[in-house]
Structure formats: C-alpha cells, structure tokens
Amino acid sequence: MDHLLLKTQTQTEQVMNVTNPNSIYIKGRLYFKGYKKIELHCFVDTGASLCIASKFVIPEEHWVNAERPIMVKIADGSSITISKVCKDIDLIIAREIFKIPTVYQQESGIDFIIGNNFCQLYEPFIQFTDRVIFTKNKSYPVHIAKLTRAVRVGTEGFLESMKKRSKTQQPEPVNISTNKIENPLKEIAILSEGRRLSEEKLFITQQRMQKIEELLEKVCSENPLDPNKTKQWMKASIKLSDPSKAIKVKPMKYSPMDREEFDKQIKELLDLKVIKPSKSPHMAPAFLVNNEAEKRRGKKRMVVNYKAMNKATIGDAYNLPNKDELLTLIRGKKIFSSFDCKSGFWQVLLDQESRPLTAFTCPQGHYEWNVVPFGLKQAPSIFQRHMDEAFRVFRKFCCVYVDDILVFSNNEEDHLLHVAMILQKCNQHGIILSKKKAQLFKKKINFLGLEIDEGTHKPQGHILEHINKFPDTLEDKKQLQRFLGILTYASDYIPKLAQIRKPLQAKLKENVPWKWTKEDTLYMQKVKKNLQGFPPLHHPLPEEKLIIETDASDDYWGGMLKAIKINEGTNTELICRYASGSFKAAERNYHSNDKETLAVINTIKKFSIYLTPVHFLIRTDNTHFKSFVNLNYKGDSKLGRNIRWQAWLSHYSFDVEHIKGTDNHFADFLSREFNKVNS
C-alpha cells in the first residue's frame, strides 16, 4: 500500500504555503487532442510520494481505473482511496517535456501536485530561493522560475471551455496565493534572473540544439524498416473489386544494361525485406526510369506499372490536404524546419491477403511487396491517414503533406519546443525520417514545391528549369500535356495563364489529329521567353486587409489578390496571387456587365480560402457591379443567374470600389489576350 501525505489546507494556509520560501509553485502545461493548451500552476511537494491532479484539468477520456486502488493517509490521520489514474502524461515545464508514468486523480484544492516520484525521476532536484532545477536525463540543467502568485483554474466547466472551437467562457481562476514576497532576497534574485539568463542564453541554445540533433538521430535511418527504430504501427489492406479475377500484364523486354541494374536493385529490396519471391496469380511489369531527378541522384528508379491493378482494386477516398489550406497555416511564421519520411510508403506494412496483389515481374523473376509500393493508387491516401493520426494534435505548428512534414513557429524559443515534440512523436510511433533531407531552423525553406522566404513565396527553381528545358518543337500530345501540367502547377504565379494555355490546349481535343507547325514552335518560344522568372508573391498576414481586382474581356477574365501592408504609417499594396480563365461558350454570349460580375465571382472562388470569413475590398472598372450587388431582383426567370449570383455573393463580406478603366492597368492586362499583348 502506497502512503501519501496530502496537505488539505484552508485557503489561508495555502497562501502561507505559497509565500513561504520553502514552498514551490511552478508553471506547467498540458496538451490533449481536441483541446487548447492547458496552463497550470503546479505545486512541487517532495513530501508527496505520488503525482496528483484534479479531474477538472485532465479530460475524462484520459482517466482509467487503477489496476489496484491506492489507499492514502491525509493530514488528519484518516484514509481515502484513489481509484483513477492517467498514464504516460507529458508535462511541459520551461519548454521541456517531462514524461510522468502515472498521475492519480484527487481533489486537493490544487490543480496539479508534482510528487517525489517525479523529483526522483528527474533528480538531482535542486531548490533555490527563486527557482528550482531538474537535471536527470537532460544534457543541460533545466531552470524553472518559482511563482510568486498561484491560481487554480480547474473548476466545473473549465475543460469544456478549453475544447477547440468551444464558445463556453472560461471560468475565473481561483487565487490560492498573495502577491506578497516575504523574503526580500527573492526580489534581488528575481532582478538578477534576467542577467543570468542572458549569460546562459547561448549555452542553453547550443545545448538544446544538441538535444534536437540527438532526437533527430534517434528517428533517422537509411532503412525505412530499421528494426531498431520502427514500431510497425502503420498497416494497410487492398481489396479487388472482383476477388475472382487475376490481373495479369505481360512482362517487358529488358536491355543488358537494365538487367544489370535490376540485379542490384532487387538485391537491395530483398535485403531491406520490403519484397519477397511471389507465387501470386497476379503480375505487373517493372521498368526503370531515368528522368532529371534520377540523373541528379545518379541512380535509375524502379517503377511498377500498376495501371491494370489500380483499375481492378477498390480506391481509398481519404483526402490529401489542400495545398492552399496548408499555406494559410504558416502565414506570419518566422522560422521553419522540414522533414521527409524515408521511403514513406515502405513504412506501411501490407496485410498478408494484400501482398499478392502487388506482385511484379522483372528479369530476376516474380516478386511481391511486404509494404505499400509506389504506384498503387491508394498509397498516398493510406499514408496521409496515418500521418494525420500521428500529428493532428500538433496542427497549430505542424502540417503534413503525405511524407513531407513542416514545423513552423513565431520565434526560436517556440521552435525548439515544437521541433522536439514532433521528433519525439516520430520516435514514439517509429516514423523514420531521412537525415540528409532534414532542414532545421530555417528562415527560408522549400515546401510543396515552393520557396518560402520572409513572408513571400514562389515556385522552386527546378519548375522554371523544367519549363525552359522543354523543346520548342513538341512530338506528341503526351509531351504537350506534360508541359501544360507544369504551367498549371505554377498557375498562381503566372499572369494570363488561361490565355497562354488556350492555343495549346486546343491541340489536345480528341477529334483533332496531332500536328505541330512552325507557328506553334514560334508560340512555344514566346511562352518560354515570357516565363524567365517567377516573382516572389506576398503571403498575406491574418490582420492585413485584402483586395481583389478583376476585369473581363470578350473571351477571358482576370483577377488578382492583394494585401495592404502597413509599415511605419505607410500603406503598401502587395500582390499575393494571380488568377485568370477563359469564358465557356455560353458565357461568351453574356452581356459585358455579366462577364464583369462573373470575373468577380470566379476570382473570389479562386481565393476563397483567404476571403472567408474576413471583410475585403473588390475593385473593378465596371460601373454596373456596385449597383448590381444592391439591386433587388424579384423572381424574373430571365434574370435567374443574377439572382443566383446575388445569393452566392451574399455569403461574403465586402465593399466595392469603382476605379476608372484607365487606372485598372493590371487586371486589364490579365484579361487581355496573350497573343495581342505579345505580338
């Protein structure tokens, strides 16, 4: 039987305890999925053998019944029984994570009591007048300032108010101390604390960076199934739409050079235990690709043609994140770190029934995968689901796109904690990272194919390289599709993209036979000449006022998103995004006023993630639009689309500013035809 001396005191006694130099209150922080951060004033009690917490500061779902109830003696000599326990809880103190194996539930008038079991776990525990120090299992001492005033937040309704998106008002904290400092030496100690921290700042930063490096080392490996690091928690299953059907695609022919390369790669895959010999009735051909990325790496990449298998299997509808939504999360952030999962899909184990479906042929024979292979249509969704489950609790400072992890913070102090928490989560789940691809503590970073730098963003340099490396004379529709795909990827950064694409897009129609003329070659040269670089665009901050400017011509519409940046009393309008498009055949017959209205609607749709739920400004040179939004259409069937447009626009909050057509230079440029502008 464990015995615990609980000091059940009156409020006066609690005040005396807090202000007494020998009693210790420190700040602590708890994180739970679905809740805001919970900040507590924790009482460090070396006379208590256990850690104790109020039921009002830890969500009910985290409490479980203790295997054996604990009988506890309290100050008046009587006994109480504690039957609820919370296991493996992380308590954040001074931006450091302290793991507590067990915390017991008991109402003591204090939110959280740090008992002697904690002090022994992180010994030596040293107490000074103004602070305490824990050092065990740390490569540096952790200094924690004592509080001169303590409060209790854990009351009825507190946890409900701390739920994310909760509209419940947080209860007022209960004061359990006074501001009085009985020991005058404490005032001197507090004043000197700033000087001490300044002297130790460089040392502490270096030590924390060393800790980050140690954590990174724990989770990095060249083997995605490293037996010393993987927890093999990610699992997947793939099903055929018709289980009775065998999916067979005939083998390919290989050159002697390819056969030699297959010998090396198949041996590597067998050594990694990601494949094994197969007796599956299914088969798909493997082949080697040697594109730009492979040439830079100096190694061809083995690919399996799963086109037939993908048609025959049931898909996974789990959505990948919207890239624009991810970018809105990092607005205003100053410091970044990014991590790449090592061969991410290979960290997901396939169940035994699914493995035969991945069977492939190559010069060495017939093999199947033990893990999720690249090329299966379900692979990105499967992996994204697992990553979201692992990192969702950290979404305020971390976003994940398939196997790319980005950590973002306002300052270096926060970032040290954020990166440590992400790496500890990777270690906990056995998520293995690539060390050579890790980028730590950067103000400028690459993510999602973008270069993010000091509040601006633009496509990475290789996007422009791909565009310029395309030949002026294209061979077939597939090559043209690849070229247009690259342009679309960078659409936010290319004014007039719709006009640029249209003459080329017309060549992809099914009923149009492939033909490439001298005029087409000249047009390709013109397109590439006009894409010599991508301007860095501003990433609008949440507090900045937004503007959209729009315009329409007979065939095209154009728009852009701008933000007003205030610097030392001066307003500067910065471009954030471009948008353009061509009107459909029926829309080309609309009145010019309707085309201008449709240009506004299309532009809002393009930038909706930034325009909800904020109030923004619409600028247009169309005099009709300002009156249109205030007109009251009364069910005239001929005006049906105007009624629909008004209803749609009513979901947004905006003002309308009319500008002269002669002043609307840029939006007008966006809507005019590319050939006319560049002829």
Swiss-Prot record:
Xref: InterPro entries: DNA/RNA_pol_sf, Pept_A3A, Peptidase_aspartic_dom_sf, Rev_trsase/Diguanyl_cyclase, RT_dom, RT_RNaseH, Viral_Replic_Matur_Polypro
Function: Encodes for at least two polypeptides: protease (PR) and reverse transcriptase (RT). The protease processes the polyprotein in cis. Reverse transcriptase is multifunctional enzyme that converts the viral RNA genome into dsDNA in viral cytoplasmic capsids. This enzyme displays a DNA polymerase activity that can copy either DNA or RNA templates, and a ribonuclease H (RNase H) activity that cleaves the RNA strand of RNA-DNA heteroduplexes in a partially processive 3'- to 5'-endonucleasic mode.
Keywords: Aspartyl protease, Endonuclease, Hydrolase, Nuclease, Nucleotidyltransferase, Protease, RNA-directed DNA polymerase, Transferase
Keyword Transferase: yes
Catalytic reaction equation(s): DNA(n) + a 2'-deoxyribonucleoside 5'-triphosphate = DNA(n+1) + diphosphate
Claim: tRNA processing is one of the keywords in the record: no
Pfam families: Peptidase_A3 (PF02160), RT_RNaseH (PF17917), RVT_1 (PF00078)
Record comment regarding domains: The polymerase/reverse transcriptase (RT) and ribonuclease H (RH) domains are structured in five subdomains: finger, palm, thumb, connection and RNase H. Within the palm subdomain, the 'primer grip' region is thought to be involved in the positioning of the primer terminus for accommodating the incoming nucleotide. The RH domain stabilizes the association of RT with primer-template.
Protein family: Belongs to the caulimoviridae enzymatic polyprotein family.
CDD domains assigned: retropepsin_like, RNase_HI_RT_Ty3, RT_LTR
Protein name: Enzymatic polyprotein
GO biological process, one term: proteolysis
Molecular function terms, GO-annotated: aspartic-type endopeptidase activity; endonuclease activity; RNA-directed DNA polymerase activity
Signal sequence interval, chain numbering: none
Coiled coil: none
Region annotated Protease, chain positions: 40-130
Catalytic machinery residues: 45
EC number, as in UniProt: 3.4.23.-, 2.7.7.49
Domain of life: Viruses
